[in-house]
A protein has these predicted regions:
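Terminal-region recognition feature
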Residues: 1-175
Length: 175
């Protein structure tokens, strides 16, 4: 215990912590300002101080792009993941397992159908939070599936790809 606490006893003690949502405040990576969550929502995740564009999650992007209640996700086929049995400090299979658990999806791609201002479209979104937005063979296959769905339904395809490059763990197969 600190010597100051021995001399001056605290007068107010709280027994329980208040539960606060984690998205109330967010720090701007551009200028370091603390930004209020509702203000960020209004400004489409652009910092009012420096103009920095903050990252959108897949869920936030869907919410901003599509008419409410129109999104229907199309399940993607499961592909063999570790073609090369790649291993550095961790095996690729372990890295994938962690990413899948953290993001709740099999790979960094989301494909589905929705509407923008009443107009139907096929949407293909890459998830930057899944292994830093790296492309894999599953990402390539998902993109092809999105194009096929768009063609079959005779509707536009919108591809949103905040990517960082190919996954080295899959080599040339990641394209």
């Amino acid at each position: 215990m600190s010597w100051l606490k021995n001399i001056i006893r605290p007068k107010i003690a709280t027994k329980t912590k208040r539960d606060m949502p984690s998205n109330i405040w967010e720090k701007c990576p551009g200028c370091g300002d603390m930004l209020y969550g509702k203000d960020l929502e209004i400004s489409a995740r652009v910092c009012n101080g420096c103009g920095h564009h903050l990252k959108f999650s897949v869920e936030q992007r869907l919410e901003h792009l599509l008419d409410e209640g129109t999104w229907s996700e199309v399940e993607q086929p499961h592909l063999k993941a570790d073609h090369l049995k790649f291993k550095d400090r961790k095996s690729y299979s372990d890295r994938l397992r962690v990413a899948r658990r953290d993001r709740g999806r099999r790979d960094g791609i989301v494909v589905g159908n929705g509407k923008i201002e009443g107009y139907p479209l096929t949407l293909c979104l890459m998830d930057f939070d899944f292994m830093a937005g790296s492309t894999s063979s599953a990402t390539g296959k998902g993109t092809l599936n999105a194009a096929a769905i768009s063609y079959e339904k005779k509707q536009p395809l919108l591809l949103v790809a905040p990517l960082s490059g190919a996954r080295m763990q899959e080599g040339i197969l990641s394209h």
